[in-house]
């Protein structure tokens, strides 16, 4: 019986394989992404309008949607009461509306994507922006981006549910809505797409990437008549940076990375402290609101979104003492408020605190413009806290349009991520999911099962038995430890010419033995003749798909032109050996062949 096969992959096989798996349905997803992008922009406008309405009503006791600035204002004890009232409202909304509105939105979006088949309750689409507007409008030290990501994602999910789509396609449209929201709020379509890739999609496929990009671009276009055009935080452009400046960018990145670790630890320490309180979580946001109000008495810059403060940091307007005060006050108030389970985003507070770290280092060293180092600190703290360095550097670039700062932004963001991945096992976003028992691996790599062929791991001397052999005879050979058949859970059945006729498994043997028919039953009669097979040039991924579809643990490997000609045997152990081989490549240290050639 022939058992040899070539390791080379025929051209006709590689010719039908492609770099990406996609089909024409990507065009349908792109078409659906267009209205989702427009909806994301409109929802962003509504959220910003709601924040202004609640801020005017809460602090100035007037009905208006005019943008207002809380920084520099003094509200006395009324300024302490307002965040408490806001916290009470949010607690009631979460208790009797939907608990999903608690938190800053991105972990909830991740949970819906990974565990909820990308299905989001319509109540969340309504309650999340309203609760966030109440939180921020009553002084909450949060940004609008987390809630708008969750809200945009909710609308994307709801829209997708109107059509016959797979869960994977719904995920694409959910993320498209999230990216559209971020693109519209900040006029940062590239950063929105990068955030989707680094944080939300968990894949790099045209099916998902292209529709998300379409939604982000559409949102940025629709944004213009709604929210205006141009960079959100225009700054004086900086010149080309020298080697010394780039070295300082690494210092800022390391400092921001350490700050990221400290802030993450502080947030979850506060969350743990609230969890120990002897009353229902519905009341926690009100207690967090008390911390907000008291913090506002000390430094009013901790109140609200604080975009004016962020812009001031980018322009280098703060002295060292003011930066230290801002960093401590904002860090404490934000951590306590977020730990209380209220509603609001993390991005704007992180920008403010990262900017304070960078500007402070710039002032202390006296190198260049403190505003530049504030920008580097902002990119770095995003890269460190959210583990999204590409998003961090491009986000600041799109906010300012200062393209000469890109090398410094890149160095700072990557340096911060390096620090946090060494110090912390998880980011501020994934830690919340881990506390619910859900671990997320965010590393992308080539699937070893897509890369390796069946011929790389198959048994080239497959276990075989003649079709007329009795079950009793085969059972005796296995019991004696006959190496030709004892090492596998299945044995291939061959006819007189050595051609594949069937397969018999250990469970088939046990059924016949228990029935007392072993001496009168042949292996061909006891086994299966309705065979699923694979080929030596098939990928392990394809072979595994066949196993899963047929609910079997082993496959005969046959010639592609003659499916009765056996060339090998593939079992679960062979597949696991492929995974082990890739693991050894990651962990085994050895010298390369170049040293051997020089001896």
PLM segments and residue spans:
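Short hydrophobic beta-strand motif reused across regulatory alpha/beta modules
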Residues: 394, 501-509, 567-575
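Generic long, charged, amphipathic alpha-helical segments
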Residues: 360-382, 512-532, 536-539, 543
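Active/binding-pocket-proximal capping segment
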Residues: 349-358, 435-436, 497, 507-511, ...
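Juxtadomain coupling helices with adjacent low-complexity linkers
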Residues: 572-599
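Bateman (tandem CBS) regulatory domains
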Residues: 450-463, 469-476, 508, 519-531, ...
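The conserved cystathionine-beta-synthase
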Residues: 465-488, 494, 511-516, 520, ...
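Hydrophobic, well-ordered secondary-structure elements that form the walls
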Residues: 344, 387, 415, 457, ...
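Alpha-helical transmembrane segments and immediately membrane-proximal extracytoplasmic
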Residues: 1-451, 455-461, 465-474, 478, ...
């Amino acid at each position: 019986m022939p058992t040899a096969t070539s390791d080379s992959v025929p051209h006709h096989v590689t010719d039908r394989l492609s770099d990406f798996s996609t089909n024409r349905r990507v065009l349908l997803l792109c078409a659906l992404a267009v209205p989702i992008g427009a909806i994301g922009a409109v929802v962003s406008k509504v959220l910003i309008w709601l924040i202004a309405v609640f801020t005017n009503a809460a602090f100035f006791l007037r009905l208006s949607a005019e943008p207002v600035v809380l920084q520099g204002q003094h509200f006395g004890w009324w300024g302490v009461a307002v965040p408490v009232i806001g916290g009470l409202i949010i607690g009631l909304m979460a208790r009797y509306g939907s608990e999903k509105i608690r938190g800053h939105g991105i972990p909830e979006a991740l949970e819906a994507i990974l565990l909820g088949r990308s299905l989001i309750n319509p109540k969340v689409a309504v309650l999340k922006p309203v609760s966030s507007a109440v939180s921020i409008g009553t002084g909450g030290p949060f940004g609008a981006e987390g809630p708008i990501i969750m809200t945009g994602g909710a609308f994307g999910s709801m829209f997708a549910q109107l059509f016959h789509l797979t869960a994977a396609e719904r995920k694409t449209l959910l993320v498209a809505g999230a990216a559209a929201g971020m693109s519209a709020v900040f006029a940062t379509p590239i950063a929105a797409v990068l955030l989707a890739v680094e944080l939300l999609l968990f894949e790099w496929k045209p099916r998902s990437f292209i529709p998300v990009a379409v939604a982000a671009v559409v949102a940025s276009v629709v944004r213009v008549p709604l929210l205006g055009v141009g960079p959100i935080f225009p700054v004086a452009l900086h010149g080309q940076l020298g080697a010394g400046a780039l070295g300082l960018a690494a210092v800022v990145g390391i400092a921001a990375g350490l700050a990221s670790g400290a802030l993450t630890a502080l947030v979850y320490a506060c969350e743990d402290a609230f969890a120990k309180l002897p009353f229902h979580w519905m009341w926690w946001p009100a207690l967090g609101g008390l911390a907000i109000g008291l913090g506002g008495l000390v430094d009013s810059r901790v109140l609200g979104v604080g975009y004016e403060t962020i812009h001031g940091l980018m322009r280098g307007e703060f002295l060292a003492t003011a930066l230290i005060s801002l960093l401590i006050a904002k860090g404490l108030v934000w951590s306590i408020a977020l730990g209380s389970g209220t509603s609001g985003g993390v991005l704007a507070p992180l920008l403010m605190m990262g900017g304070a770290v960078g500007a402070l280092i710039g002032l202390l060293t006296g190198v260049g413009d403190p505003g530049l180092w504030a920008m580097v600190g902002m990119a770095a703290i995003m890269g460190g806290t959210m583990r999204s360095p590409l998003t961090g550097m491009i986000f600041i670039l799109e906010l300012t349009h200062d393209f000469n700062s890109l090398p410094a932004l890149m160095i700072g963001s990557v340096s911060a991520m390096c620090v946090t991945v060494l110090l912390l096992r998880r980011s501020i976003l994934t830690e919340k999911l881990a506390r619910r028992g859900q671990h997320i691996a965010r590393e992308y790599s080539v699937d070893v099962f897509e890369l390796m062929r069946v011929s790389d791991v198959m048994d080239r001397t497959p276990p075989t038995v003649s079709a007329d052999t009795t079950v009793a005879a085969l059972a005796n050979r296995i019991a004696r430890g006959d190496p030709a058949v004892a090492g596998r859970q299945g044995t291939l059945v061959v006819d007189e010419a050595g051609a594949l006729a069937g397969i018999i498994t250990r469970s088939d043997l046990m059924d016949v033995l228990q029935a007392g028919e072993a001496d009168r039953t042949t292996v061909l009669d006891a086994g299966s003749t309705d065979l699923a097979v694979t080929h030596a040039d098939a990928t392990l991924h394809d072979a595994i798909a066949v196993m899963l579809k047929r609910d079997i643990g082993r496959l005969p490997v046959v010639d592609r032109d003659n499916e009765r000609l056996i060339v090998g045997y593939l079992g679960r152990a062979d597949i696991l050996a492929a995974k082990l081989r890739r693991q050894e490549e990651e962990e085994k240290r050895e010298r390369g062949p170049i040293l051997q050639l020089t001896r």
